């Protein structure tokens, strides 16, 4: 079980956030959940805000399959990629089956943040997050917004993606 803050002698040394990203042709979102405070933090096409948030000292970020996808697309965001470059990076990984760290925008860069991948802790690496959620009787909520929509999302579409 993932606990929130990592402590040493009662002193907090790392705060843990679980995160996920969603990428569209002209929009990207990063959603963080502070597992101690139960607070959600959302960034939408805000490279500077995202960088200010993620590069603070003492933070650790976790996700599911993030070491192969989310971490590297987030690296593009942190290093100033526009939404269209972020989408190209996304498609490089998903459609072309490329390694996220080999995408030209981030190639040869050191990852700027510390993270762990929850998928590393399961025996069957073929299990999807949806299968795990189903096994736990958790609701599986998917956005109705097409990831290949070729325009900026409307306000209501953005809200659906976030929640």
Model-assigned labels for residue ranges:
Residues 10-13, 18, 52-57, 144-163:
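Proteins with a high burden of low-complexity, intrinsically disordered sequence enriched in S/T/G/P/A and R
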Residues 28, 68-162:
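Metal-dependent phosphoesterase core characteristic of DEDDh/y 3'-5' exonuclease domains
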Residues 2-7:
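Extreme N-terminal basic, low-complexity initiation segments
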Residues 9-97:
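Conserved RNase H-like, two-metal-ion catalytic cores of nucleic-acid enzymes
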